[in-house]
From Swiss-Prot, chain B:
Disulfide bonds: none annotated. It comes from Gluconobacter oxydans (strain 621H) (Gluconobacter suboxydans). One of its GO terms (biological process) is regulation of division septum assembly. Transmembrane segments: none annotated. The keyword Transmembrane does not apply. Prevents the cell division inhibition by proteins MinC and MinD at internal division sites while permitting inhibition at polar sites. This ensures cell division at the proper site by restricting the formation of a division septum at the midpoint of the long axis of the cell. Belongs to the MinE family. This is Cell division topological specificity factor. It comes from the Bacteria. Gene3D superfamilies: Cell division topological specificity factor MinE. HAMAP family: MinE (MF_00262). The gene is minE.
Length: 270, 92
């Protein structure tokens, strides 16, 4: 049974596209068939982060409007054959996405793949609501920063009211992914801690992705961090998050480089 | 001063300030939903103006309504500027 997962946040720039690419590649490397779908019409970037920008011929809107078949628009990743991307349109108006058209495409994707991961646009408008509407699960990407936490709270409210699951009286399975986390600053009380954010948002923790140079280096070369630097700290956090999404029970910890004093200092057992 | 205050002042940690601010804000946003917040103020403003207008002629702009929320209690501040000649006539 295919799972539809939306990666969302409300606020822009917190790491939705990075996380979509990294989680998608991590799940695909475990042998599952994964498609990542860019819902950010007019500002598509998932293709660029995944290194597929020169291979885009047709996009989500072409498929929604019936101008292209789904198989024509899907781009298979060259490094990982179980990973595909469905790009957004860069030129078309986002009003071209109709609810019925999106529903049809989502049904078709559910048949082909084990995971359909929807990269939501920022904001709480139509585009973001279309991206979350069909979701069974949601990853809420949050930075340890007041504006991001506030917007995540808002998005959690929308997931509980404006999705197909909510309309049927069911719940979208929500998970918090804390990104750009700096354990040293959190320890100095200069940054909201994992516990602070969890207490405020009260949804289960999927993973903690530390602030890292490897994330930018990977997007520079057009590869998800879980493909470009699989042993790096952020990649390890994403691999573990992917295993949790698949149902494994793993303890969440802040990934740290070496075992030693700092490891002991920042180790979490929640 | 800043050197000494850095050493001696016991400032509140910024992360706990952030957490407190968020908790207060979200407690109200979750309850209020979309536009409940500004609606309440607008409604209060309208009704308070009606009551005052029954007794004295007060300019709309001379009534200030503010809300200040704390974790323990919230304060509703109503500031009405009464015309000069009226304050003399009180009790008549």
């Amino acid at each position: 049974m295919a799972k539809v997962l939306v990666v969302t946040s409300g606020k822009g720039g917190v790491g939705k596209t990075t996380s979509t690419a990294a989680l998608g590649a991590a799940l695909a490397q475990s042998g599952q068939n994964v498609v990542v779908v860019d819902f950010d019409v007019g500002l598509r970037n998932l293709d660029l982060v995944m290194g597929a920008e020169r291979r885009v011929v047709f996009d989500l809107i072409n498929v929604v409007q019936g101008d292209a078949r789904l198989s024509q628009a899907l781009i298979r990743d060259k490094r990982c054959e179980t990973l595909s991307i469905l790009p957004a349109s860069q030129t078309r108006d986002k009003d071209a996405l109709t609810s019925e058209g999106v529903a049809r495409v989502m049904d078709e994707l559910r048949e082909k793949f084990d995971w359909v991961i929807c990269d939501s646009p920022a904001g709480i408008e139509r585009g973001a609501q279309l991206a979350m509407y069909h979701a069974d699960m949601a990853v809420i990407v949050t930075n340890p920063e007041v504006s991001s936490v506030r917007d995540s709270d808002r998005i959690i409210g929308l997931l509980d009211s404006k999705t197909q699951k909510a309309e049927r009286g069911e719940k979208v399975d929500k998970h918090l992914l804390l990104t750009r986390y700096d354990p040293a600053r959190a320890a100095r009380k200069e940054m909201l801690s994992v516990e602070d954010v969890l207490e405020i948002l009260s949804i289960p923790l999927l993973g903690i992705v530390p602030e890292s140079e490897d994330v930018l280096k990977s997007s520079n070369v057009g590869a998800p961090v879980t493909l470009a630097a699989p042993t790096s700290l952020p990649a390890r956090a994403y691999f573990e998050a992917a295993r949790r999404l698949s149902g494994e029970k793993l303890e969440v910890s802040v990934p740290v480089e070496k075992r030693g004093f700092f490891d002991w200092l920042f180790k979490r057992d929640a | 001063m800043s050197f000494l205050s850095n050493i001696f002042a016991r400032r509140q940690q910024s992360s706990s300030v952030a957490k407190d601010r968020l908790q207060i804000l979200l407690a109200h946003e979750r309850g209020a939903g979309e536009a409940g917040e500004s609606d309440l103020i607008r409604q209060l403003h309208k009704e308070i103006m009606e009551v005052i207008a029954r007794h004295v002629a007060v300019d709309q702009d001379k009534v200030q309504i503010k809300v200040d929320r704390g974790s323990g209690c919230s304060m509703l501040e109503i500031d009405v500027e009464v015309p000069q000649e009226l304050s003399g006539k009180r009790g008549s």
